[in-house]
Every structure is written in C-alpha cells, then in structure tokens.
Amino acid sequence: MTEAPTWEVDLFVDGPITLNRRYRTTQQKGFRPENPFYSDVEMAGIPSGGLRATVTARAPNERLAFDAAVVFFGRMLDALAFEVDLPLFLSLTEEGPRNSRVRHHSRQIIGHQLIKNAFRAADDLGMTEPAFLRSLGWYRKGLYTEDPLDKFLAFWNAIEIVAAGYYRTVESIDQEQAKKGSKNQIWGCFIALWGECERWPNIPGDDRWIAENYETRTKIAHGISPVDIETVTSVMNRLDVIQRVAHRFLWDWREEILHAGWDPASQSAPNSDDEALPF
C-alpha cells in the first residue's frame, strides 16, 4: 500500500503571547508505536501578538492534512492556554477570529520549556486522561470566544466533563447521589476536592452556586431564555466567577486527583527533538 504523502501546514495563533526566538521540535504524533509518525513543528512569534507555526502532517489530501495538524497542534494549545490562562485562538489565516487583526500591546513571552511541557501534557493526557484533555479544550474556547453565552457554556462544560468523567473513580463521592445527574456529580467532586462548601475557593459558602449556574446553562443550551439585554447582562455578570472556579477546579483536579501536574524541571517528551533557533 502506498504511503500517504507528507504535507506542511501553516497555522496561526492569535493571542497576547510571543516567543523571543524561533523554536523547532519533532514530536511523535498518534499512539501507534508499530508505525509512528514524527511531526516537525516550527514556531515563531508574530510582532502584533501570537504565533506562526508550520506543522508537518501525513495524509492522503490537503484537507485531511490540515485537520490532522489542527487537532495535533490544537491539543498542545489547549494545555498551553490553560497553563498561562490567556485566550489563544487557532486559525489557518493570520487575520485571526476577527475581520482585522487586533494588535496585542502587551504580550507574555513564552519560554521554550512551556512549549515542551504543553506538548508533553497533551500527549500524556491524550493517552491516559482523554476526558480531562477534552475539558481543557472547552476551557480554551471559553477564554477566546467573544460571545458571552458561548463563553459561559464553555467554562461550564469544562467543569461538567471532568465531574461526569471521573466521579465514579473517587471513593469518597456518594455514587448513588451522583447518579442523579450532573449537579450532584459536580457537588460530589467539589466536596471530594475541597471539603465542605464553606471552604470552596472563589465561592465559599455559596451552596446555590452549582444549581443556579446549572439552571443558567440549561436555559442557554436549550433556548429557553430569550436572547435579550437582560439575559446577556445576567450571564456576563457570572463570567468572571465561573472562569475562576473552572480554572481552579481543573488545576486542583489535575494536581490532587490525577497527579498529573507539570514538573518545571521536566525534560522534553520521549521521542522528541527540540531546538531553539538563533533568529
């Protein structure tokens, strides 16, 4: 059988970040040790903010090559966006999510170790904790989307996916109660992670927070609430808190339950070759 050709795919990341030097790495893509494919990735900062990346992908046609590169690079971006907690939008064109590119006057300089760690985290989570990696994808969407309703749903989904995917694995959670639905699953996970409601970070003592936000989620997702100024304002008033709760929940779940936190001194992932380019 003829081997699929290898393509180069150009991708652009819009966001308040940059690299101080070009960066190149080779990463194993996919989880087939009997037939591994190594993807070359080269990245550079964009003066107005963001990154330009060229990713190699093996696929029978251009469309599938682009899709494969987006999934592969996007998972790394999910891990990176969560770590730096900044909106990072991935696209095929340099214009980004809006008609004209917005210049980011302040840009966090991303070190090469952060990029290495993000690739490694995406690879490890993809193999061992795919539900958690999917929740990071929703969290990144919550960071970059400009629609307040979509932003709320994305942050809620990030919480809900972890609760639904892992409550059965935590012995201290009341399994019979959790089976009644996502509100109970989230409640059980919060208790297991942080203790009683009075100790919950960002929402201490607010025992109505889960129920009220679940109701908001249901009204948005099912089109029950009219999309008027009152609804939008109400949702916007919830965004700051739900973002902080989602980030803290995912962070603590990763560290305390999954024990999958980043080691700042960790080396690059196995089967990778990294190089900082001098220009």
Q: Where would I find each of the regions flagged by the language model?
A:
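Terminal, compositionally biased low-complexity regions
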Residues: 1-113, 171-204, 252-279
